[in-house]
Amino acid sequence: MYQVVKRDGTEVSLDLGKIKTAIIKAFEASGIAYEENVIDFIVLKVTADYASKVKDGKIAVEEIQDSVEKVLSESGYHDVAKSYILYRKNREKLRNIKSTIIDYKELVD
């Protein structure tokens, strides 16, 4: 099984369930109904899309997320892709805020 390289450099085993959950959340956020088998098919397409990006059994989490965006959009789920992109942007903002707070706290200490 592949290893996913997280943003902090740590590695975890690839969990397709996490990809599936993220896609379901994007569908729910966009208010679009979905079928379980469609979600499973999208997950399979995502794995096929990022397969060429795997190097030495490892792939960066951002590469997987890019593949999710691409597959959702190419599958005609543009609104779902937008929801997914917005979720990623919001998570990035939160990470940046946390990093800034930690940096500030270290400065003060």
Regions found by a protein language model. Give the residues of each.
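Extended catalytic cores of very large enzyme megasubunits
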Residues: M1-D109
